[in-house]
Amino acid sequence: MEYEVTKDFDQITLKDDFMFFSVMSDKELCKELLERILDIKIKKLVYVAGQDTKKDSYDGKGVRLDIYTEDSENTVYNVEMQAGKSTNLPKRSRFYQSAIDLNQLHAGMDYDALKNTIVIFICTFDVFKKDFLKYTFKNICMEDKELVLNDATTKVFVNTTATLDDENLNPKLVSLIKYINSETITDEYTKKLDEAVRIKRRSADWRVKYMKYELNLLEREREGEKRLATLMDLLYKEHRFDDMGQVASDEEYRQKLYKEYNIQ
């Protein structure tokens, strides 16, 4: 089968999910990234794992490349680079949160055993169109906005397209964003990131992994096209023309109809 990758391995940067996944598997680089995004100090990361997940994605069919890590203060972090536009990120953050909780809580365990969790998406687009550099969400009471649920869950969406000239912004986060956007080195940390990226590019092993990853994406894209074609054919035969229009643009509704028609 002829195959051509979407981007040459020598050209991928930290904003590409595969390179981000590769570089952030390094505990110290991941630790400082989290510190810059969350504006906190982390004593120690005790566990870092890259999750090349193919069956536990939002729709059960896609590929996830995200980093799962825990610190010494009982907090779990899940961080992912999002370089392509997605209308499902808020619900995907809910899915990731649920998956983390299920992984932690075994039958018979007390809910107090659940750790603090922070789900982070670094997006090369503005999910919420407010030009904030960072959107942080916690569950609050709608009748009293100062009343926080304190369920120990946080979801963060970083917007790399935000205006960066606000003097109130965290300069370390701004430096990170500039590197993600254009590989501009402005401090010691971004220099380390750049060195790590270059090392990965020179690695024959990572080059092969990238080719396999891209091939996997292509195969899954073709599977998705076949499923969509099958669904469209069924909808056409049943004269569900309005549904045909909706599934073309609404992924959540498309997944619902896949289940309705049992299209695997």
Set out the residue ranges of the language-model regions:
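Short, charged alpha-helical interaction segments and adjacent helix-coil junctions
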Residues: 1-10, 14, 18, 77-82, ...
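Accessory alpha/beta interaction modules
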Residues: 1-154, 164-166, 251-253, 258, ...
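Extended serine/threonine-enriched, polar tracts that run as long, contiguous segments within proteins
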Residues: 159-162, 168
